[in-house]
């Protein structure tokens, strides 16, 4: 779990904490949880290291997907993707529209597959992370979800 923020600390990172707890409750192991500033190269370096680690199968990022001057998660991570998972951003924005209306057009949530690791990039709000988890991620990271899920494409499976 990687929080992208210039202001969050371990104590104030409610989105990262939510994702860590949700993953644990669903039976997943957490290899690492970090906070990185909104910097393309620092973000790319951490995620590249995790992609290269055979123990890391899924990366969830929160933050840096908006339009402020320093939001850079899409620019940092999209070049690392071997394949994009366009449906994640599409479904996330559709779910978000029911909650925040037209403001959802400002979401640049995205996902991709890199070296057998799936990477999901969500906005920084805890509500957005909850929407993504409950509406997409919980099922797609569950090997028993039918008709399909991402477990079969992960490096370790």
Residue ranges and their predicted role:
Residues 2-157:
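Non-catalytic beta/alpha edge segments that cap or flank active sites
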């Amino acid at each position: 779990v990687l929080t992208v923020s210039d202001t969050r600390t371990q104590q104030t990172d409610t989105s990262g904490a939510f994702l860590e707890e949700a993953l644990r409750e669903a039976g997943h192991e957490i290899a690492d949880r970090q906070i990185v500033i909104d910097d393309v190269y620092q973000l790319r370096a951490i995620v590249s290291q995790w992609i290269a680690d055979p123990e890391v199968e899924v990366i969830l990022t929160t933050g840096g997907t908006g339009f402020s001057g320093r939001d850079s998660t899409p620019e940092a991570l999209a070049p690392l993707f071997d394949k994009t998972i366009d449906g994640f951003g599409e479904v996330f924005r559709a779910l978000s529209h029911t909650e925040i209306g037209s403001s959802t057009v400002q979401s640049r949530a995205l996902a991709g597959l890199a070296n057998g690791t799936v990477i999901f990039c969500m906005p920084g709000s805890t509500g957005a992370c909850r929407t993504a988890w409950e509406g997409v991620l919980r099922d797609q990271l569950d090997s028993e979800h039918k008709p399909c899920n991402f477990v079969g494409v992960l490096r370790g499976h």
